Design a protein with these regions (language model features):
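Boundary regions of SH3-family modules and the immediately adjacent low-complexity/disordered segments
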Residues: 1-17, 52-54, 64-99, 146-165
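Beta-loop motif signature
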Residues: 5-6, 14-15, 22-59, 93-144, ...
Length: 165
């Protein structure tokens, strides 16, 4: 049984895993429908977004993000193995604007809606603000948000703000 965080990490099997590693951390990496820079983008992802690598074909990797979002990313912008630990996370740290909070118990306990697709008419689900989640990417006017169960959903960018510090 591992006694330290480092020992625990050493036991984790990172085979087939990578993280987004753009040399410009303010930029994001496209997930594309085909292994071609001109194909449709399914979103752009921040540094340290974890991806499962299903296949590598030349300079492209077919990846899955979360449970079921898959497409192609350029391998030169992915970090593998021990290099993954060196990538700084670029996920934005934002707060939900108060008028979009549902079932409010207090300032840290409330629900909010996320959408199954990046449009306001898509099916929506309530998530709880107290549960851990990450803003991993963007598509159009939506952030892509992933919870610890690897569910990827969408939230309008204008529902979130940087807060008062």
């Amino acid at each position: 049984f591992p006694e330290t965080y480092a020992e625990m990490l050493a036991q984790v099997d990172s085979t087939n895993w990578a993280v987004v590693n753009n040399p410009n951390p303010t930029d994001r990496l496209h997930l594309r429908t085909e292994p071609d820079r001109k194909s449709v983008s399914l979103g752009k992802f921040y540094n340290r977004t974890p991806v499962y690598v299903d296949e590598i074909r030349g300079e492209w990797a077919h990846v899955t993000i979360g449970r079921d979002l898959s497409g192609w990313m350029m391998t030169k912008y992915l970090a593998f193995g021990e290099e993954m630990d060196k990538v700084e996370c670029a996920f934005p740290q934002l707060a939900l604007i108060e008028k979009y909070q549902e079932n409010v118990a207090d300032e840290l306990a409330y629900d909010y809606y996320v959408f199954d697709a990046p449009n306001m008419s898509a099916t929506k689900t309530l998530w709880n603000w107290g549960e851990e989640c990450y803003l991993i990417g963007v598509i159009d006017d939506f952030y892509m948000i992933m919870d610890t169960d690897e569910n990827v959903r969408y939230i309008p960018q204008d529902w979130l703000w940087a807060g008062n510090g």
